Amino acid sequence: MAMLGALDPAITPELAQSTWALLTPFHEKVGYTAPKIDRDLTYGDDPRQRLDVHTGDGGHEPAPVVVFVHGGGFVAGDKHVPGTPRYDLFGAWAVRRGWIGVTMTYRLAPEHRWPAGAQDVASAVAWIRNNIEGYGGDPGKIVVAGNSAGAVHVADYMAGHGTADPAGSLAGVAGGVLLSGIYDLAPANRGQLEHVYYGDTPAEQASTLPGLLDCQVPLLFTVAEFDPPNFHAQAAGVVAAWQARHGRTPDLVWVEGHNHMSTIASLGIDETALGVPLARFIERHTAKEGTGAHA
């Protein structure tokens, strides 16, 4: 993966195209789809409120469920791009490890602004709680992961934004994974796309860091070596706040050799950087009975 370091780390369509062009041949060689995928299951009335369930050949016991929320700058992206590994690779990765994979898509800005993303994550998790047993999954062992804008939506969900019942919304959730997210939404930290999604929402409402510090669900944060500087600053802010509140550092992975796009795109072909520590986190927090929040 050394070639990723030669790419301009700025988050642009060119970075996405170049990253996927480099990594897709590796996925095509090893395969990037689970044995069975049930597509476009609806968890709401909007056309974008859809999810795919990725399963294997089945096991004797209900399996943990790992959910992935894609990025796209709040205004783009999808759970599945036909003919590419996006993002069936995540479902395949989960299934190879004996879990159920779920990839979801959600409503986009500017038509749907904050906290629509968090509300969609909550609705998708509610659907999973109510339906995943039919696919061999354990509704009490759900881990929710998001990348970039997806991480922001997952962070909002974990912080209780957009719901009248934050604790109930997290029922069955055993862990949250925040891959290169933004947690401090002070005006100085907002770019054009953040303004499209958040509008004039005050920082004290939009920022998730205070809620994450109080969250009872185990959390894993990541930042990529070649993430732009603002993502490193966000990760440093999480570490400082966590140390001040809890007297220790949070679970955090520095994803060596990867950029903002390749962190998730590497799953299944470069396990050392993210796959192994991510799997270890999931295993640790789904290994026991009743591990989900308020199980």
Language model: regions and residue ranges:
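Short, surface-exposed "cap/lid" segments of acyl-processing enzymes
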Residues: 50, 57-93
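Acidic catalytic loop of the alpha/beta-hydrolase fold
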Residues: 184-185, 226-230
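Primarily recognizes the serine-hydrolase "nucleophile elbow" in alpha/beta-hydrolase
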Residues: 123-192, 204
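Catalytic nucleophile-loop/oxyanion-hole region of alpha/beta-hydrolase
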Residues: 82-90, 102-140
